[in-house]
Amino acid sequence: DLASANTRARLRMTTLYAIAGSNNGIVVGTGNKVEDFGVGFFTKYGDGGVDISPLADMYKSEVYALAEAMGIAQEIQEAAPTDGLWNDGRTDEDQMGATYEELEWAMREIENSSSEPLTARQGEVLEIYWRLHNANSHKMNSIPIFKR
């Protein structure tokens, strides 16, 4: 279930901090703009718990371009994105119901709304985007505090 999957992400984060702490290092995040600020596709206090997030202002397409420019192994570049929290092979895109390319389009469409008519799939992707964005907004916003 989702609670168990999120626990795996939190244990992974704890392990990464233990390794970083033992080596005078930091934990570097891998989230991109769509995940971190669009649909909130990360575990609160799990893979979202990092010291620095160098890719967070980059769309997934930009991350792929960067990987290509850096000469990252093709096998890694072509691997289906997955959070690794499930033992059934499901990908990020299986879980979200849209591809990163589609969700990137949705973010850009919202930022720079065009007057072009939408296809049925584009309308569906916008609905997926807003559903995920709204459901996960608690992850993307600062922790609420009570003013005295």
Where are the language model's segments positioned?
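ATP/NTP-dependent adenylation/nucleotidyl-transfer catalytic domains that generate, transfer
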Residues: 1-10, 14-17, 21-26, 30-34, ...
